[in-house]
Amino acid sequence: MTHPIFMVGARGCGKTTVGHQLAQALGYDFVDTDLFMQQTTNMTVADVVAQEGWHGFRQRESLALQQVASNRCIVATGGGMVLAEANRRFMHDKGIVIYLHADAELLAQRLEENPQDNQRPTLTGRPIAEEMADVLAAREALYRGAAHHVIDASQTPDAIVVSVLKALRLSAA
């Protein structure tokens, strides 16, 4: 197995944490699309959104996805990467898509516990628990539709990595 592995899911589901660990376990490279955009634009996600709006950010996000996708690479995507049908198709066709699924309450709890990880501006301006419930309601079908494997992200990062590795082994058999 050498195809890229794309991690999708809402903010706080563990894409970056699990992606790093999975890359180490597999001997793959690791790239986070948000971090890649920050490095290539010299702007934070919030700055890009402030200057170019969400539409401009989503365009940059799609370009970043195409630039970083390579064999033997784990790609942690932004939570909204699945909003563009072209991104879903690209990930599904080019690699293996892992959806890290967690409920809105757990996502909100994680984001509140680690506010430094919450670099992306709020989508709605409402409390994070309400926003995460709305985001999941709008995106759940997109995440599942793009995914080759759905993994329970309420586990510890180590347990999630084990679950992903098991799913990858089963699909390769």
UniProtKB/Swiss-Prot annotation:
Identify the CDD domains for this entry: SK
**What coarse category fits the chief subcellular location reported for this protein?**
cytoplasm
Taken from the UniProt entry, a GO cellular component term is: cytosol
Query: Which class of enzymes does this protein belong to?
Result: transferase
Q: Which UniProt keywords apply?
A: Amino-acid biosynthesis, Aromatic amino acid biosynthesis, ATP-binding, Cytoplasm, Kinase, Magnesium, Metal-binding, Nucleotide-binding, Transferase
For the biological process aspect of GO, one term held by this record is: aromatic amino acid family biosynthetic process
Quaternary structure?
A: Monomer.
Q: Which NCBIfam families match?
A: PRK03731.1 (NF002988)
Family statement: Belongs to the shikimate kinase family. AroL subfamily.
Q: What is this protein called?
A: Shikimate kinase 2
